[in-house]
Amino acid sequence: LEVHRRAYRGSIVNSFMEIFTLVTGVIYIILEIRQKNLMWVVGILTSIAAMWVFFRQGLYASFGLNTYYLVTSVVGLWQWRRDIDRISQDGAAHDDGTVRLKHLSLKTVAVSALAVVAGTLVLAMVMEHLENPMSYLDSAVAVLSAVATWWLVRCYIQQWWLWIAADTVSTVLCASQGLWWMAALYAAYAVSAIIGYIHWKKHGRYIG
Protein backbone atom coordinates (compact mmCIF):
# COMPACT_ATOMS: atom_id res chain seq x y z
CA LEU A 1 0.00 0.00 0.00
CA GLU A 2 2.84 2.37 0.89
CA VAL A 3 4.47 1.68 -2.47
CA HIS A 4 1.25 2.65 -4.25
CA ARG A 5 1.00 5.84 -2.19
CA ARG A 6 4.54 6.83 -3.09
CA ALA A 7 3.90 6.12 -6.75
CA TYR A 8 0.73 8.21 -6.62
CA ARG A 9 2.50 11.12 -4.92
CA GLY A 10 5.29 10.87 -7.47
CA SER A 11 2.77 10.97 -10.29
CA ILE A 12 1.09 14.07 -8.82
CA VAL A 13 4.42 15.87 -8.43
CA ASN A 14 5.47 14.90 -11.93
CA SER A 15 2.21 16.20 -13.41
CA PHE A 16 2.60 19.45 -11.47
CA MET A 17 6.13 19.90 -12.78
CA GLU A 18 4.95 19.25 -16.34
CA ILE A 19 2.20 21.87 -16.01
CA PHE A 20 4.63 24.31 -14.37
CA THR A 21 7.04 23.78 -17.26
CA LEU A 22 4.23 24.38 -19.73
CA VAL A 23 3.16 27.66 -18.11
CA THR A 24 6.65 29.09 -17.62
CA GLY A 25 7.63 27.82 -21.05
CA VAL A 26 4.84 29.79 -22.71
CA ILE A 27 5.89 32.91 -20.77
CA TYR A 28 9.48 32.28 -21.87
CA ILE A 29 8.63 32.06 -25.57
CA ILE A 30 6.57 35.28 -25.41
CA LEU A 31 9.49 37.09 -23.80
CA GLU A 32 11.86 35.55 -26.35
CA ILE A 33 9.81 36.81 -29.28
CA ARG A 34 9.79 40.29 -27.70
CA GLN A 35 13.50 39.86 -26.93
CA LYS A 36 13.19 40.75 -23.24
CA ASN A 37 16.06 39.99 -20.90
CA LEU A 38 13.60 38.60 -18.32
CA MET A 39 13.22 35.53 -20.53
CA TRP A 40 16.52 34.19 -19.22
CA VAL A 41 15.27 34.29 -15.61
CA VAL A 42 12.05 32.52 -16.58
CA GLY A 43 14.14 30.08 -18.58
CA ILE A 44 16.02 29.06 -15.44
CA LEU A 45 12.76 28.12 -13.71
CA THR A 46 11.52 26.26 -16.77
CA SER A 47 14.76 24.32 -17.07
CA ILE A 48 14.75 23.18 -13.45
CA ALA A 49 11.20 21.85 -13.77
CA ALA A 50 11.97 20.15 -17.09
CA MET A 51 15.07 18.53 -15.59
CA TRP A 52 12.87 16.91 -12.96
CA VAL A 53 10.43 15.55 -15.56
CA PHE A 54 13.03 14.21 -17.98
CA PHE A 55 15.19 12.62 -15.27
CA ARG A 56 12.24 10.68 -13.88
CA GLN A 57 11.32 9.59 -17.40
CA GLY A 58 14.85 8.40 -18.15
CA LEU A 59 15.37 10.87 -21.01
CA TYR A 60 18.87 11.77 -19.88
CA ALA A 61 19.90 13.69 -22.99
CA SER A 62 16.96 16.06 -22.50
CA PHE A 63 17.87 16.28 -18.81
CA GLY A 64 21.41 17.25 -19.74
CA LEU A 65 20.11 19.73 -22.29
CA ASN A 66 18.14 21.59 -19.65
CA THR A 67 21.22 21.65 -17.43
CA TYR A 68 22.96 23.32 -20.35
CA TYR A 69 20.05 25.78 -20.56
CA LEU A 70 20.78 26.89 -16.99
CA VAL A 71 24.33 27.77 -17.93
CA THR A 72 23.43 29.52 -21.18
CA SER A 73 20.75 31.52 -19.38
CA VAL A 74 23.45 33.13 -17.26
CA VAL A 75 25.56 33.78 -20.35
CA GLY A 76 22.51 35.12 -22.18
CA LEU A 77 21.73 37.60 -19.41
CA TRP A 78 25.26 38.96 -19.61
CA GLN A 79 25.46 38.98 -23.42
CA TRP A 80 22.11 40.67 -23.97
CA ARG A 81 22.78 43.21 -21.24
CA ARG A 82 26.00 44.15 -23.01
CA ASP A 83 24.21 44.49 -26.35
CA ILE A 84 21.54 46.69 -24.76
CA ASP A 85 24.25 48.95 -23.34
CA ARG A 86 25.86 49.11 -26.76
CA ILE A 87 22.61 50.20 -28.39
CA SER A 88 22.09 52.82 -25.67
CA GLN A 89 25.55 54.24 -26.32
CA ASP A 90 24.66 54.54 -30.01
CA GLY A 91 21.69 56.68 -29.02
CA ALA A 92 18.94 54.13 -29.69
CA ALA A 93 16.31 53.09 -27.18
CA HIS A 94 16.06 49.38 -26.44
CA ASP A 95 12.33 49.48 -25.75
CA ASP A 96 11.40 51.01 -29.12
CA GLY A 97 10.43 47.60 -30.47
CA THR A 98 13.73 46.99 -32.23
CA VAL A 99 15.06 43.43 -32.22
CA ARG A 100 18.85 43.14 -32.08
CA LEU A 101 20.30 40.89 -34.78
CA LYS A 102 23.78 39.68 -35.70
CA HIS A 103 25.00 38.26 -38.99
CA LEU A 104 25.46 34.48 -39.17
CA SER A 105 28.69 33.49 -40.93
CA LEU A 106 29.17 30.43 -43.15
CA LYS A 107 31.91 29.29 -40.77
CA THR A 108 29.44 29.27 -37.87
CA VAL A 109 26.94 27.30 -39.96
CA ALA A 110 29.57 24.72 -40.93
CA VAL A 111 30.86 24.28 -37.38
CA SER A 112 27.31 24.06 -36.02
CA ALA A 113 26.30 21.43 -38.60
CA LEU A 114 29.34 19.33 -37.75
CA ALA A 115 28.58 19.68 -34.04
CA VAL A 116 24.98 18.52 -34.55
CA VAL A 117 25.96 15.40 -36.51
CA ALA A 118 28.94 14.40 -34.37
CA GLY A 119 27.25 15.34 -31.12
CA THR A 120 24.14 13.33 -31.93
CA LEU A 121 26.10 10.17 -32.77
CA VAL A 122 28.33 10.36 -29.70
CA LEU A 123 25.53 11.25 -27.31
CA ALA A 124 23.26 8.53 -28.70
CA MET A 125 25.89 5.88 -27.99
CA VAL A 126 26.11 7.09 -24.40
CA MET A 127 22.33 7.17 -24.06
CA GLU A 128 22.04 3.56 -25.28
CA HIS A 129 24.19 2.43 -22.36
CA LEU A 130 21.84 4.34 -20.03
CA GLU A 131 18.88 2.46 -21.53
CA ASN A 132 17.35 5.60 -22.98
CA PRO A 133 14.16 4.44 -24.77
CA MET A 134 14.61 6.96 -27.59
CA SER A 135 18.40 7.40 -27.65
CA TYR A 136 18.98 8.79 -31.15
CA LEU A 137 15.88 10.98 -31.28
CA ASP A 138 16.48 12.31 -27.78
CA SER A 139 20.13 12.99 -28.59
CA ALA A 140 19.35 14.75 -31.88
CA VAL A 141 16.88 17.06 -30.15
CA ALA A 142 19.34 17.77 -27.34
CA VAL A 143 22.24 18.68 -29.62
CA LEU A 144 20.11 20.66 -32.08
CA SER A 145 18.52 22.60 -29.22
CA ALA A 146 21.93 23.28 -27.68
CA VAL A 147 23.12 24.85 -30.93
CA ALA A 148 19.85 26.78 -31.29
CA THR A 149 20.23 28.18 -27.77
CA TRP A 150 23.73 29.40 -28.52
CA TRP A 151 22.49 31.02 -31.71
CA LEU A 152 19.78 32.69 -29.61
CA VAL A 153 22.41 34.08 -27.25
CA ARG A 154 24.25 35.44 -30.29
CA CYS A 155 21.00 36.96 -31.67
CA TYR A 156 21.04 35.08 -34.99
CA ILE A 157 17.59 35.18 -36.58
CA GLN A 158 18.24 31.72 -38.07
CA GLN A 159 17.97 30.24 -34.58
CA TRP A 160 14.21 30.13 -35.15
CA TRP A 161 14.69 27.61 -37.98
CA LEU A 162 16.51 25.28 -35.63
CA TRP A 163 13.82 25.67 -32.98
CA ILE A 164 11.05 24.81 -35.44
CA ALA A 165 12.83 21.54 -36.27
CA ALA A 166 13.81 20.69 -32.68
CA ASP A 167 10.41 21.52 -31.18
CA THR A 168 8.55 19.49 -33.79
CA VAL A 169 10.66 16.43 -33.06
CA SER A 170 10.36 17.06 -29.30
CA THR A 171 6.57 17.07 -29.62
CA VAL A 172 6.68 13.60 -31.18
CA LEU A 173 9.23 12.39 -28.63
CA CYS A 174 7.22 13.50 -25.60
CA ALA A 175 3.94 12.19 -27.03
CA SER A 176 5.52 8.79 -27.63
CA GLN A 177 6.46 8.66 -23.93
CA GLY A 178 3.01 9.75 -22.71
CA LEU A 179 4.25 13.17 -21.59
CA TRP A 180 1.21 14.99 -22.92
CA TRP A 181 1.74 18.29 -21.12
CA MET A 182 5.31 18.43 -22.36
CA ALA A 183 4.15 17.50 -25.87
CA ALA A 184 1.68 20.40 -25.74
CA LEU A 185 4.48 22.71 -24.62
CA TYR A 186 6.76 21.77 -27.50
CA ALA A 187 3.91 22.02 -30.00
CA ALA A 188 3.30 25.56 -28.72
CA TYR A 189 7.04 26.21 -29.00
CA ALA A 190 7.03 25.12 -32.66
CA VAL A 191 4.17 27.45 -33.55
CA SER A 192 5.73 30.28 -31.52
CA ALA A 193 9.05 29.78 -33.33
CA ILE A 194 7.32 30.55 -36.62
CA ILE A 195 5.76 33.66 -35.08
CA GLY A 196 9.10 34.61 -33.57
CA TYR A 197 10.89 34.40 -36.90
CA ILE A 198 8.30 36.63 -38.55
CA HIS A 199 8.53 39.16 -35.69
CA TRP A 200 12.34 39.27 -35.72
CA LYS A 201 12.36 39.56 -39.51
CA LYS A 202 10.00 42.54 -39.36
CA HIS A 203 11.54 44.41 -36.43
CA GLY A 204 15.18 43.31 -36.65
CA ARG A 205 18.16 45.64 -36.66
CA TYR A 206 21.66 44.30 -37.26
CA ILE A 207 24.18 45.50 -34.69
CA GLY A 208 27.14 43.34 -35.67
Feature map (PLM): residue ranges:
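Polytopic alpha-helical membrane-helix bundles and their juxtamembrane interface segments
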Residues: 12-35, 39-40, 46, 83-91, ...
